[in-house]
């Protein structure tokens, strides 16, 4: 699995426009073959700072995404709204997910 993690810094007056651009990009990416999830979220303590979290089956899937017209549209649209250049990293990971009892984790930390 490939995980993409990025930081996007948007001009405060253009946050709503950026949210629309991100919503459209997320919708397109989630419909692509090999996309497991694609989400944007704004950092609560830092308005205008958005994080993107993507999960892809493999390199081929993310390469297809980068070549898609929707990704090119996103790049063009978001570029004019940025305060500074975005930061983005890809990580190759093994899928080792398993259920976790979050109540137990909190309880164990309190001991």
Stretch-by-stretch model annotation:
Residues 41-46, 76-111:
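Glycine-rich beta-strand-turn "strand-cap" elements at beta-sheet edges
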Residues 24-36, 55-90:
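An amphipathic, aromatic/His-enriched active-site/gating alpha helix that lines ligand/cofactor pockets
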């Amino acid at each position: 699995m490939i995980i993409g993690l990025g930081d996007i810094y948007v001009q405060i007056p253009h946050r709503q426009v950026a949210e629309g651009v991100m919503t459209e990009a997320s919708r397109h990416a989630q419909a692509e073959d090999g996309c497991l999830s694609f989400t944007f979220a704004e950092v609560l303590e830092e308005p205008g700072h958005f994080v993107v979290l993507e999960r892809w089956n493999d390199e081929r899937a993310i390469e297809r995404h980068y070549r898609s017209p929707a990704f090119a549209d996103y790049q063009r649209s978001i570029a004019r709204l940025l305060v500074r250049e975005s930061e983005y990293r890809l990580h190759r990971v093994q899928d080792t997910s398993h259920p976790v009892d979050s109540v137990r984790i909190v309880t164990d930390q309190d001991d």
